[in-house]
Regions:
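Domain-level signal for soluble alpha/beta catalytic cores
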Residues: 1-473, 477-598
Length: 598
């Protein structure tokens, strides 16, 4: 099989099984570095690879899983020597069978900041060294596997995309509760890895076929039907007596049968599996075609532990923005990060689902500050972030350190803006907000704004950004100054939803600027926009009236099934009118009591 045929197979292909399992059976001593055997005993390693290829593995992983500077510290061999020998051994073994050789890459063995001490860019540099050595040695593809930290996987994927041209398979290990050891969800993994350029996503290790299946099903549902998905389960669970794993090759093959319904790109085994396990999978997946029926992809924004599916109205907190706020501007100039973090925490507590982040203020270094604020925010909140800036460098620095899949606010219809912002969003897997404005300014007519939105949408699609990640802002104009254009915004929003199939966003509070009792206008305009199809409402989540409108709307449109969220939020609250009546009724009684006491 040629590399360019990898994702064009008409049948689910087989991966290999456990390397450590085979080496332990061959007498590998506890604490020894398996990767050094690439040089000290190449015949042993080559023989294991050949057994897997003979069993039907079309992709065989080189013995390079632990080849990192940290894990090889003190070795007599360099990282490059071990990787080169590992790739060459695997290629020799695979050649007679037409199997491909994968550079197998695992976690570095050090925790990244903020959980550990390894800086993100140092991790990227370490992975760059690994993948460049693998490509130079002749690897056909890169196989990142057994990751539990999404941030480390991001570092690995960036290194591979920036330094090689090899196809990339990316896999994480999930526990029985459906999250990795660090709390990452299946959906956050899928959205982030796909966005960063992985060519296939999968699940390996930790559990057996039966336990992994529900998570594999979620993974398949979280990516397009034609996007490759794979699995490499363990041979069940380790036996208590340390004598191996509790699933036989025959039972493993039987438990893998339900995976046929997922139409996987590939399947194999991990810890405890051997060539016999892989050989039996030939029958399990005989005639199984990869690829699932097309389905409408949700728009997902995420951090590792919090996956927000934008399906209907979603609240974006607007308060992390210094515009018109002297205290906020002062905090940014003084580096008062606590003030910024307080805004994040209070909005999260009020019910925001996403946080807008704008740090553009006079007298600050916006790119440096954006990076610092993104890192700081992700240390105190799990909510996804909307990076809000017109400064390309600030967006680039924020996107690079962000852990998960963010949204960028914004670009517009100007060609130079599109050319600057869209490639950034593509590289870092971010969703994009497009303002329906161009070099000619804001158009008063809805049709003209839709025309600009169409150009933005076409440019984003051409840049490789999926339609579900395109958001159009039809621009909220102030009712005090441009009252006649208010309805045009709502009309344009509705047309963008129907004609372009994109998501929509509005800065709701702009509508009331300069007018009294702003909450009345904001809430009414929000309701109009929701009815027209608004997806992201950039607003103040501390506004009880606006949040009530959102929750009530979700009940009345059947999005909040059984009114579960509405009841949870409002069951214990007393309406303002009732509270006033109760206070008025209590007042005379209180006065009478005071009189009696005197």
């Amino acid at each position: 099989m040629q590399v360019n045929e990898l994702f064009k197979q008409s049948n689910t292909i087989l991966l290999d099984g456990g390397m450590g399992t085979m080496l332990q059976a061959a007498g590998l001593k506890l604490g020894a570095r398996p990767e050094e055997l690439n040089i000290t005993d190449p015949a042993l390693i080559e023989g294991i690879h050949a057994q897997y290829a003979a069993a039907g593995s079309r992709i065989v992983n080189a013995n390079t899983f632990g080849a990192s500077a940290h894990k090889l510290a003190g070795s007599a061999y360099t990282l490059e020597q071990i990787i080169t020998a590992g790739i060459e051994n695997c290629k020799r073994a695979c050649a007679p069978y037409g199997a491909l050789t994968a550079l197998d890459v695992g976690p570095l063995g050090e925790l990244l900041e903020p959980s550990g001490t390894l800086a993100f860019e140092d991790a990227v540099a370490e992975y760059a060294r690994i993948v460049k050595a693998g490509e130079a040695a002749g690897a056909d593809l890169i196989f990142f596997e057994t990751y539990t930290d999404l941030y480390e996987l991001k570092a690995a994927l960036l290194a591979a995309k920036e330094n090689t041209r090899l196809p990339i398979l990316a896999s994480m290990s999930f526990e029985a509760g459906g999250r990795t050891f660090t709390g990452c969800t299946v959906e956050s993994f899928a959205a982030t890895a796909r966005g960063l350029g992985a060519d296939a996503v999968g699940i390996n290790c930790s559990l057996g076929p039966k336990e992994i299946f529900p998570m594999a099903k979620r993974l398949a549902e979280a990516v397009p039907g034609n996007f490759p998905v794979f699995v490499k389960p363990n041979a069940g669970l380790p036996r208590a007596d340390g004598s191996g794993y509790d699933i036989t090759p025959q039972l493993f093959a039987l438990q893998m049968k339900p995976y046929r319904a997922l139409h996987l790109f590939a399947a194999g085994g991990c810890c405890g599996t051997t060539p016999e396990f892989i050989k039996l999978l030939n029958g399990t997946f005989a005639g199984c075609t990869p690829g699932r029926p097309a389905h409408r992809m949700p728009s997902v924004l995420c951090t590792p532990v919090d996956t927000v599916t934008v399906d209907g109205i979603t609240v974006v907190g607007e308060r992390i923005n210094p515009t018109g706020k002297k205290r906020f501007q002062q905090a940014l100039r003084e580096g008062d990060m606590n003030y910024v973090l307080e805004q994040a925490v209070s909005q999260a507590e009020a019910g925001a689902q996403i946080l807008d982040v704008n740090v553009g203020a006079p007298g600050v270094d916006e790119p440096v500050l954006m990076e610092q604020v993104v890192k700081a925010l992700q240390s105190v909140t799990s909510l996804p972030l909307q990076l809000d800036s017109s400064n390309v460098e600030a967006l680039a620095r924020g996107l690079r350190v962000y852990n998960g899949k963010p949204i960028v606010n914004s670009t517009n219809g100007e060609p130079e803006k599109l050319a600057a912002i869209l490639p950034l969003c593509k590289k870092y897997g971010a969703a994009i907000v497009g303002l329906a404005i161009d070099e000619k300014g804001i158009q008063p007519k809805a049709a003209d704004r839709v025309a600009i939105a169409r150009r933005i949408t076409e440019a984003a699609l051409a840049a490789g950004i999926p339609r579900e990640d395109i958001y159009i802002d039809c621009l909220t104009l102030t009712a005090s100054a441009q009252q006649e254009d208010v309805l045009a915004t709502v009309q344009a929003l509705e047309a963008c939803k129907k004609e372009l199939g994109v998501r929509t966003v509005l800065g709701v509070s702009n509508i009331s600027f300069g007018l009294p009792c702003r909450t009345y206008l904001n809430t009414t305009f929000l309701t109009m926009a929701m009815y027209a199809g608004l997806d992201l409402a950039i607003m103040n989540p501390s506004s009880e009236e606006m949040m009530a409108a959102v929750y009530a709307y979700n009940v009345l449109t059947n999005r909040d099934r059984q009114s579960t969220k509405y009841i949870a939020r409002f069951a214990d609250r007393v309406p303002a009118s009732t509270a006033l009546a109760q206070a008025a009724k209590a007042a005379p009684a209180a006065s009478a009591a005071e009189t009696e006491l005197t």
